[in-house]
């Protein structure tokens, strides 16, 4: 009987963990969907600029974006976009057509070049405000622990009042 109770407890725990794991998924939008949604419910836009050959991009997708805290912040404070920097799709934004003019393997899309201001480094995250205006680009891999304060810094509009270093220092003293 004890073994049966233990087995049921373990299975119940696994189902609970599975439920939490499902809730921890980031709701990803296309760039166009995020811009369209922003017309009716204003949020900042988080754009993960990646390539399919980038190892750090894959690590960030598998670890950072799978973190339930990160997923929750992205799902509630942002429209999260995963943007393939080498896509062949034509994207309309602010009355302009963005395309991939290179036509070769690994040629960057014009929108990726614009978002990253010509500094083609992967992974990178571009942030747009609620009016779809560029805020900044943050290049490089970020673990969940490093990304969380960055997400909050922009979500809370703290970037309008103080440097990121001051924001992080202030958070440490209040926690």
Predicted regions and their residues:
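Bacterial Sec-dependent N-terminal signal peptides
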Residues: 1-23
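Sec-dependent signal peptide cleavage junction
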Residues: 18-33, 161-175
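A short beta-strand-turn-helix
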Residues: 27-44, 74
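Thioredoxin-like thiol-disulfide oxidoreductase module
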Residues: 31-33, 68-139, 144, 149-160, ...
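Short active-site neighborhood of thiol/selenol oxidoreductases, capturing the structured segment around
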Residues: 41-55, 80
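A conserved hydrophobic position in a structured secondary element of the catalytic/binding core
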Residues: 49, 65, 83
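Extracytoplasmic/secreted cell-surface and envelope-processing proteins
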Residues: 56-57, 135
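Detector for the c-type heme attachment site
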Residues: 58-62
């Amino acid at each position: 009987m004890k073994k049966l109770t233990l087995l049921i407890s373990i299975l119940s725990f696994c189902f609970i963990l599975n439920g939490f794991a499902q809730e921890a998924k980031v709701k990803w939008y296309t760039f166009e969907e995020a811009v369209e949604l922003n017309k009716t419910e204003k949020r900042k836009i988080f754009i993960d600029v990646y390539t399919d050959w980038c190892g750090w991009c894959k690590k960030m997708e598998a670890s950072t974006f799978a973190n339930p805290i990160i997923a929750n912040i992205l799902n509630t404070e942002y429209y999260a976009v995963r943007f393939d920097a080498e896509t062949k799709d034509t994207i309309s934004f602010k009355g302009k057509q963005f395309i991939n003019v290179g036509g070769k393997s690994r040629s960057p899309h014009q929108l990726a070049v614009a978002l990253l201001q010509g500094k083609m480094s992967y992974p990178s995250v571009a942030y747009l405000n609620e009016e779809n205006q560029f805020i900044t680009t943050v290049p490089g891999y970020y673990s969940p622990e490093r990304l969380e304060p960055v997400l909050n810094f922009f979500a809370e509009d703290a970037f309008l009042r103080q440097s990121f270093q001051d924001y992080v220092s202030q958070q440490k003293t209040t926690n």
